[in-house]
Amino acid sequence: MDFLIDALTNWLKEMLVGGIMSNLSGMFDSVNSQVADISVQIGQTPQGWNPDIFNMIHTLSESIMVPIAGVLLAIVMTIELIQMIADRNNLHDVDTWMLFKWVFKSAAAILIVTNTWSIVMGVFDMAQSVVAQASGIIGSDAAIDISQVMADMEPRLMEMDLGPLIGLWVQSLFIGITMWAMYICIFIVLYGRMIEIYLVTSVAPVPMAAMMGKEWGGMGQNYLRSLLALGFQAFLIIVCVAIYAVLVQNIATEEDVIMAIWTCVGYTVLLCFTLFKTGSLAKAIFQAH
């Protein structure tokens, strides 16, 4: 009877140990690939990220938004002229410089609207340059490597009792699911930011048309701040990845494999949390809303 119990126990141990090793091996491959892809993704301009989407957004902006911006520009500058006249006692105190000022502001507004796309792309080109320089300075490997920790793991697991092994198997299964969730979160942050950039740039001529208006100018100014926030969000993401890379380098020295794995999970959750916060932080820095 004892022989059967021992055989059954060993069989369960082998099955649980095999399941644990299977769950842990390659667990971080998807997260590592996604983290490594962060620098590539955020270091690209809207045109380089997906040329087809870029061309579609450019066409929509030029064919639909620019005419609307022209109408808005005419309304804004007409209101501006009326206010300038009203402020000067209904033409009783009008000076010639007022008309020159209005003509200059109108010309500047037209110039801004006609060159909106170049201005917007210039913001992201500048942000790309900043990210490229930051990546060159940081240059850290952010891949999680637990191969050293798992080298002698299987013999140690076989020495454990059945109860703790069941607990470890459940933990390894849960950690594997968590890693896939983290992979999806990182994917959402990266692709969500790029889609937001395309959405914001598609309507660029409309807020830029109001840039020179006295009362409407806040629309254009806030739009520019939003562009800068989106651009420099990439720099904040690079900093997050750099901090994450420094943290994960110390994992290989951990002797307790489960502690090392849970530490990996904690660092990855922390990375996802900070990535989600970069958008609001960038907007707070540039006072965009």
Report each predicted region and the residues it spans.
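Alpha-helical transmembrane segments and their helix-start/interface "positive-inside/aromatic belt" motifs
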Residues: 1, 5, 9-23, 94-112, ...
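Alpha-helical membrane-interface segments at transmembrane helix boundaries
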Residues: 57-66, 97, 101-104, 162, ...
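Non-cytosolic segments of integral membrane proteins
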Residues: 16, 31, 106-203, 237, ...
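Juxtamembrane "helix exit" motif at the C-terminal ends of alpha-helical transmembrane segments
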Residues: 70, 74-86, 237-252
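Alpha-helical transmembrane segments
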Residues: 208-225, 252-254, 284-285
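Long, low-complexity, intrinsically disordered extramembrane tails
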Residues: 1-2, 283-289
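Hydrophobic transmembrane alpha-helix segments characteristic of membrane transport
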Residues: 72-110, 203-217
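Binding/recognition "hotspot" determinant
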Residues: 1-72
